[in-house]
């Protein structure tokens, strides 16, 4: 995934920032609890293609983002 593209992409619903999950090939919006797929290195930023995060996924991502960097 191109780093420059990641810097300018925002959530199409709330216009908020996204978290890139390389292993899952998804861009996640914590505000809306949505995960947008990345297919063949192309982000699919459509509401209809996004999946809702489970409560467990959401909590894990929030905790990971809040953890201090050592």
From Swiss-Prot:
<dbReference type="InterPro" id="IPR005651">
    <property type="entry name" value="Trm112-like"/>
</dbReference>
<dbReference type="GO" id="GO:0005829">
    <property type="term" value="C:cytosol"/>
</dbReference>
<comment type="similarity">
    <text>Belongs to the UPF0434 family.</text>
</comment>
<protein>
    <recommendedName>
        <fullName>UPF0434 protein MCA0634</fullName>
    </recommendedName>
</protein>
<dbReference type="Pfam" id="PF03966">
    <property type="entry name" value="Trm112p"/>
</dbReference>
């Amino acid at each position: 995934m191109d780093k420059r593209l990641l810097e300018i992409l925002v959530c199409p619903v709330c216009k908020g920032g996204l978290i890139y999950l390389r292993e899952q090939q998804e861009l996640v919006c914590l505000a809306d609890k949505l995960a947008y797929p990345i297919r063949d290195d192309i982000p699919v930023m459509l509401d209809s293609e996004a999946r809702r995060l489970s409560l467990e996924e959401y909590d894990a991502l929030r905790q990971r983002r809040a953890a201090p960097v050592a």
